[in-house]
Amino acid sequence: MSQSHSILSSLILLVAIIFCVPHVIAVPWTTDGHAQLSPVTPRYPTQEPSGIRYRNVIPQLTWLCDTAIEKIFGLPPKVAKKPDVPGNVARPTNAQLPATLLAKYGGDVVLRFNLTTPAEEQALAEAADTLFLDIWEFTSNWADIRLREDDVPSLLGLLPKSLQNAYSHLMPDLAKSIYQSYPSMAYADAAFSSKHVERAFTPALRTSKVEGADNIFFQNYQPLSVIIPWMRLMSSMFSTHVRMINIGISYEGRDIPALRIGVSPNLPSEATKPRKTIILSGGFHAREWISVSSVTYAAWSLITSYGKSPAITKLLQEFDFVLVPTINVDGYVYTWENDRLWRKNRQQTNLRFCRGLDLDRGFGFEWGSSTQTNPCSESYPGDAPFQAVESHRFAEWAKNETENNNVHFVGFLDLHSYSQQVLYPYSYSCLADPPSLENLEELGIGLAKAIRISSGEQYTVASACEGAISSKIPGYSSTSRMEMGGGSAIDWFYHELGVRYSYQIKLRDTGSYGFLLPKENIVPTGEEVFNVIKYFGDFLLGDKGIEKAKSSEEEPITKPVKSELPLGVMEEESVISDEIEDEYEDINLELKRRRR
């Protein structure tokens, strides 16, 4: 009986794979356990949209596909439900927290300082550098700093009187907040007791639904050990328009995987032209988990919208999208296994006890403008340009694509967190304006409006060079900033590689949770990024984000009912476009205001 059940299960799995995966691509593995992915990306076959069509023709196959995926990934573990934060729900006491977590972050707090003058900004930056404090984030109004509660008097003693009372406790108990940020209490316990954490968390493909999401993959943050198989599955299930590629190898020997999404042109004359390509990257800084989940969400939305959404179908015919969930794969793994707030990569420095380089300060353009020479600093760029292995691999891959693979990069969107900002070059200095400043501002304002119209969230638009208060004071250019900006990725792609539209987008939130954004924000933030991509693509097509699908002259693409919409395809897509069209005049008014 047991043998018959096993045979039946195997047959179900085989049939499901045949229906769910139109062209399964074998991914070879090296002897060290890493996927052997070719950095040279093959062109896509010219086929009609597939992969998703099976679910439309035979809806019953949805159950069969889910069964197959559950067999591949496993069922959800039975763990206690994690209490929500904040609210009246009971939180774990210090006695319940893992000892290693308490040893590292017990007694740590996050303070927010309100800044109003250049002198205050400079004083806070110098004090934080003197005490080796972790500057979490800063904007035109505030700066968030992590430190031990016992060190607060020392910090205040280095600050002017105007700042000594201009702060508040953003996170009064950081250790508890970190513990709450893991997908499950069981996983958090395992993360601080054993390095073999993949056994403690097995992703499931079906459970109780989260509002606004039908896929459990986006109901929680996922570790790299889950993201890579998921990417491999996407490339197999939707092989007509998706390829899994490798950007390079990290310092610790891990692959840096990416998904290339797009459809090759049907006409031979078009196929010989350089392929216009847009990059969406996340995870430069390991602790910024929402940037990683937002890249995977955007990838899923693009992949499953092809053939269903006319706007997305056209974008994938006109552009390739390369989506890199995390450049900093070593650091990202480290945040799951050891230190949730680790920021840099895991590269060795000249100080044995201070590992890691800031990948977003390691690129070659204006690298020398970053004066941080302390290897223990969270912003340490290394001793030379491109010393950071992952930054070097990323840049080399991009150059190789343009020089040898007939690729023309037309856009670069680098996701970070937090503070809800859309930033454009230059990052290294406020004294130099980019040649295409007006175009960068115009598109940046449009991206922020696309987010506001779709979700109501406010994203500010500014030059990446602006310090904590420099944008407030006309004619003032900050030279002593909270964090030096030389060697940034957006500057290098813009200036060295000639990518005309290069942006850093700092995602949710504005500080209530900081890097520890609750899982309930994964889908809403992912939707914001997806709307950014749609507006970005339409803008490059010359449609200013208000493209309308042709009706009578083309064969219509049936729009499914709401319950059948793939994750990420918003029913109100046309409504959003109409509202963007109505408000496009506001963008011109904003640009005129900035010119005064």
UniProtKB/Swiss-Prot annotation:
<feature type="binding site">
    <location>
        <position position="416"/>
    </location>
    <ligand>
        <name>Zn(2+)</name>
    </ligand>
</feature>
<feature type="binding site">
    <location>
        <begin position="417"/>
        <end position="418"/>
    </location>
    <ligand>
        <name>substrate</name>
    </ligand>
</feature>
<dbReference type="GO" id="GO:0008270">
    <property type="term" value="F:zinc ion binding"/>
</dbReference>
<feature type="signal peptide">
    <location>
        <begin position="1"/>
        <end position="26"/>
    </location>
</feature>
<dbReference type="InterPro" id="IPR000834">
    <property type="entry name" value="Peptidase_M14"/>
</dbReference>
<feature type="binding site">
    <location>
        <position position="285"/>
    </location>
    <ligand>
        <name>Zn(2+)</name>
    </ligand>
</feature>
<keyword id="KW-0325">Glycoprotein</keyword>
<feature type="binding site">
    <location>
        <position position="343"/>
    </location>
    <ligand>
        <name>substrate</name>
    </ligand>
</feature>
<keyword id="KW-0964">Secreted</keyword>
<feature type="glycosylation site" description="N-linked (GlcNAc...) asparagine">
    <location>
        <position position="400"/>
    </location>
</feature>
<dbReference type="GO" id="GO:0005615">
    <property type="term" value="C:extracellular space"/>
</dbReference>
<feature type="propeptide">
    <location>
        <begin position="27"/>
        <end position="190"/>
    </location>
</feature>
<feature type="domain" description="Peptidase M14">
    <location>
        <begin position="220"/>
        <end position="540"/>
    </location>
</feature>
<keyword id="KW-0862">Zinc</keyword>
<comment type="similarity">
    <text>Belongs to the peptidase M14 family.</text>
</comment>
<feature type="glycosylation site" description="N-linked (GlcNAc...) asparagine">
    <location>
        <position position="114"/>
    </location>
</feature>
<comment type="function">
    <text>Inactive carboxypeptidase that may play a role in cell wall organization and biogenesis.</text>
</comment>
<protein>
    <recommendedName>
        <fullName>Inactive metallocarboxypeptidase ecm14</fullName>
    </recommendedName>
</protein>
<feature type="disulfide bond">
    <location>
        <begin position="354"/>
        <end position="376"/>
    </location>
</feature>
<feature type="binding site">
    <location>
        <position position="288"/>
    </location>
    <ligand>
        <name>Zn(2+)</name>
    </ligand>
</feature>
<dbReference type="Pfam" id="PF00246">
    <property type="entry name" value="Peptidase_M14"/>
</dbReference>
<keyword id="KW-0926">Vacuole</keyword>
<dbReference type="GO" id="GO:0005773">
    <property type="term" value="C:vacuole"/>
</dbReference>
<keyword id="KW-0961">Cell wall biogenesis/degradation</keyword>
<keyword id="KW-1015">Disulfide bond</keyword>
<feature type="binding site">
    <location>
        <begin position="285"/>
        <end position="288"/>
    </location>
    <ligand>
        <name>substrate</name>
    </ligand>
</feature>
<feature type="binding site">
    <location>
        <begin position="360"/>
        <end position="361"/>
    </location>
    <ligand>
        <name>substrate</name>
    </ligand>
</feature>
<keyword id="KW-0732">Signal</keyword>
<dbReference type="GO" id="GO:0071555">
    <property type="term" value="P:cell wall organization"/>
</dbReference>
<keyword id="KW-0479">Metal-binding</keyword>
